């Protein structure tokens, strides 16, 4: 079997694109998941001590720092030790429990407290807190800064190109002129709105025992309010919100909402990448050329919009996986089946493709060279677009059948030029003031507000 490295990795995220997506390993790798599990187990144990349970009253709080160091200083060697234990237990979360017990032995003086590690919990109390925590931190530390960098770049272009008139295209055909900056601002507006909706989605966790009822906790210590304990632990120690009513596993409804929100943002980015691709095809933009790069193995002249194409492809893959995650995870037979387990292990995959896509989008945007001449000429060659302006003013003046008159003039296979428009204006039976108003309208100034 081949040794795993960038060349032998099956996934391009861990192979070809590792340099772009590698930061996500701190959140979604096997190592990261194990570390998050250790963190949750340790913080849970400390919270039981703070309650305190009668048997934990004698554990001095000065030891908490050394307990937290178990996950704060967690190493690859530690993760390997857990995998060794798992090879015997054939259970990943139980292996974490046994590892922590070993660490307690190394610290010394904790023997009598070890059975309160993972006390009253099921594996999903650890998984359904660890994974939401990893998603929360990946969003906050990687995704949000990157998507906001993209929005900032688009916003800068929107301001820079605010006053550049441009021929609009609806159905691929000339339409009322617009401004390049405004068209870029459309994407800024859309992304900001959907990003706000994503940030508003609560990141929730399941924490309630084997079937969500705190059975084990309640039978051992019936005097405690375990729901209040769970709410406080999940909120204060993990920064998450506890789901009040669950089966053995999370309901995943809120996680599904997060994935759906990310999917909508991806769809906007696909739209954006396709538009810039099209503008390049229309020669509204040229691209900065980097010495030594090759655009085609056969055609030496090629400078292709590969960054926008790469982004579009990766976003499509991400959306396909996000769609499955949001559709599948909320469905589980009775109090739970195991289908969520293997699916959840793929949560980092769409994040990887999204991170790659945003970086590719940024790279493509930063290579753009505005071709104002092409934009001007395209607009100047399409005087038919002022027909809307003329017929609207004529309507205002109660001119008979203005729409039909302009339709007869412009809906033809003949070229409509500045001359033909101005000649038409002279034939109109309107006042000289109205004609003056009509004469000043051009494709370059008929751009709205």
Where are these regions (language model features)?
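A helix-coil-helix interface module used to build multimeric assemblies
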Residues: 2-214, 221-233, 295, 308-310, ...
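Generic, well-ordered alpha-helical scaffold segments in large soluble proteins
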Residues: 43-47, 99, 103, 138, ...
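Active-site-adjacent "gating/activation" loops or surface patches in catalytic cores
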Residues: 224-248, 252
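Short amphipathic alpha-helical segments with heptad-repeat character
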Residues: 136-144, 148-151, 155, 185-188, ...
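Alpha-helical coiled-coil oligomerization motifs
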Residues: 159-162, 203, 277, 284, ...
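Glycine-rich anion/phosphate-binding loop at the beta-strand->alpha-helix junction
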Residues: 194, 241, 247-333
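Proline-centered turn/helix-capping motifs that create local helix->coil transitions or kinks
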Residues: 105-111, 199-202, 281-284, 319-323, ...
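Catalytic-core signal marking the mid-to-C-terminal active-site face
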Residues: 2-30, 66, 294-449
